[in-house]
Amino acid sequence: MNKHGKVIDVMISDRQALIQFEREGDARRAVDREKGQSFRGNRIDVRFASTSDGSFESRSEIPRNRSPRPLPYERDSRDMSPYRDSGRDRSPADRERYYKALRRGDSSKIIEEPENLNNRHGSPDSYRKYDRSRGIVEEPRSRSQLHQDYPVIPKEIQEPKWNSPPFTDKIGTERPGFDAAIIVMSSELLSYAETIESRLQRQIALTTHIIVLKEESHANACVEDLNNKGVLYAFLVNSLNEQHFSCTLRILYGTPQEHRNMPLNNALTFVARNFERYQKHVRDLKTIAPKPTFDPSRMPPGFIAPDDKIIYYLHLLADSRMLTIEELNEVIDFVQKRMQALASAEETMEKAPITGLPNESVQNSMAPKLSIPGNQPVREEKVIQHQTQLHSKILNILKPVPHQSASGVVDNEINNMEQFNTYNDSNISTSKSNNMVINPKVQQALDTLMQSQFRPTAPELSAPAEENSRNFQPVNNPMANPYSMNPTPNMRPINPHSTQQRPMAQGPGGQPFGNSFHGYYQPPIGQPIFRGRPPFQPRPQYPGY
């Protein structure tokens, strides 16, 4: 607007701006030339400000809307009076002219001054704010009567149809009404901050916001608060930056960056390119993350579909792009939720009964195998129960059935029992030779247990002979076992744990049998040597046969 004439004051609100020229002709020329022009892709409407009756008034301003909740380090916005030099602080010369005008009584030259320059509202704050942003303008708390003569703005100007919403840094999250914040360390640097602001608005079309700090130590807290509010850029300016025409640039969105003492021209070029990439990033959020084409009702139970944000992050990871820690945490949380849902669904399917399978083995093979810690105790209990059942079945098989009592049949049964005992002892001795590391006490207990399990008792000798004949085959049958002989009643067993010398049993031709029937019975004098074996033992190979 400076090309149409000298501008005295500019008032900017959310949806309109009021520009006051020094001369009325300049204002009419600006209206004729700027009406219907395009600004940032939108058509603008330029007209004269008027009162409620439609008449033109040279000094026209709009009421200021109250901004959102002020920052914790801000003080009230400095009101922009048309008689003040762009809202800058009073110099001692201005303050002296103010008091001289009061003494002379010339009210036309009185410069508006706040009630208390040092403490405007009674409680000093650590920060002071110089607000000329687009969209965040605060109304003075104690001087609202200064704006009573403002005209009524037409509804067409208050709510133009061409107004566009602000950019969004994240999906569904709106940022404040400015893109860049210019933070100055003292009020003497406001002129340099205004220079940066004008170049940002003219060259890059960024909405800006000027903040004045009272102490430099509050700069980090101010930048952190701006980052939480979603501001894109922050320019930090001190006295040295003004001398060297430089600034400290901080990029707050995405991966934070800081460029200290960067020349202003280079900083503006860098911000222009970065802001263009940011706009492309916002547009890509809608194009790269399409809506899912699958039907959730056809998905398996426990399936969690990713939203647009997660799909976009996954595309970036697939393209080897860099993500921030917050974005990676969102992806990790989604993956963990999906894993938990799938694990719970598989656990439910495992507990449900499975029907229509051919047998138990196929059912066990088709059952899902989960590595969930909660199923481990259940499996251990099943294994222990299965082992207990097998142990009981083995004991039932090996446990002798009570039998009967005819002398010949009893002798055959005793012969079979003793032969089976001899065979088990031989197997125990063989296992002992294979595994040398066996506790002697454990071995003695096993021998005693085997002796007690297979030794016939007195009631067993009184069982009927018919039952014994049905369950046992006589071993003295030459066709069944031609090498066996019935033991005589005067055969006495030898204690296997005694130190008595045991003679080696002899086979046909005087050859020893070996370790299979080593000395469990000592025949009396004149009796033949015992040469029997259990029916299920394989036939030993003797030399000479």
From Swiss-Prot:
Keyword field: Developmental protein, Nucleus, RNA-binding, Transcription, Transcription regulation
Disulphides: none
Compositionally biased spans, kind Pro residues: 535-545
GO cellular component, one term: nucleus
Disordered as annotated region, ranges: 26-131, 498-545
Effect of a null allele: RNAi-mediated knockdown results in severe impairment of regenerative capacity. The cycling stem cell population is significantly reduced at 8 days post-injection. Isolated stem cells are unable to repopulate an irradiated (and thus stem cell-depleted) host.
Main location: nucleus
Functional summary from the UniProt entry: Probable nuclear receptor coregulator that can have both coactivator and corepressor functions. Important for maintenance of the adult pluripotent stem cell population.
Name recorded for this polypeptide: Nuclear receptor coactivator 5
The organism of origin for this protein: Schmidtea mediterranea
Gene that this polypeptide is encoded by: NCOA5
